[in-house]
Amino acid sequence: MKVLILACLVALALAREKEQLSVPTEAVGSVSSSEEITHINKQKLETIKHVEQLLREEKLQDKILPFIQSLFPFAERIPYPTLPQNILNLAQLDMLLPLLQPEIMEDPKAKETIIPKHKLMPFLKSPKTVPFVDSQILNLREMKNQHLLLPQLLPFMHQVFQPFPQTPIPYPQALLSLPQSKFMPIVPQVVPYPQRDMPIQALQLFQELLFPTHQGYPVVQPIAPVNV
């Protein structure tokens, strides 16, 4: 009997706990439903307020428009073009700007078609510049010829160049009357020339050493006539 009584008491206690747990769940459900209802009511109030504002703005526009038309009776609305629905969006930069695609930029042929290069004129080398440069540089053959000609010119190297005879320059009286501090003295230029006793062959060898001749240039003539 005692066991039966204990079992009944345990069953009653469990039933009471279940009832207590069911009560807060029902309360939570009722609270959540009430919150949803309040949120819906707030949304309805906001929509009603927005509609009322729109109606007020329309009424104000209806009042202002006739007043403006009375001031400007010939005023008309500015027409604007309607764009078709198949127009490309501005965000599609891949279609509008093919230069930004890396695949196209890697291909050299596509680069040439998209970005044409400016062709430069070829630099034409003038034939006149070549002998001028060659005249500045001595060839090996000419150097060898100079070494061969040096022993032939050794007996004539002791001769000293003689300058032209200096002639006095007459100055006008106006220049002579001025003080010397106002002008610099004029130094006469002295041009050396070889002695007239030098033979023609030695003179030609001497000229070839001083002024090497090349193809395309005339032979340098002596400065003064030579008498044999």
From Swiss-Prot:
User: Signal peptide span per the entry?
Assistant: 1-15
InterPro entries hit by this protein: Casein, Casein_beta, Casein_CS
| Gene, per the UniProt record | CSN2
Q: What does this protein do?
A: Important role in determination of the surface properties of the casein micelles.
- The organism is Oryctolagus cuniculus
Offer one Pfam family short name for this entry. Answer: Casein
Location, primary (coarse class): secreted
Q: Which family does it belong to?
A: Belongs to the beta-casein family.
What does the UniProt entry say about where the protein is found? Secreted
UniProt protein name = Beta-casein
This protein's UniProt keywords: Milk protein, Phosphoprotein, Secreted, Signal
Gene Ontology cellular-component annotations = extracellular space
The tissues in which it is expressed are: Mammary gland specific. Secreted in milk.
| Modified residues annotated as Phosphoserine in this record | 30, 32-34
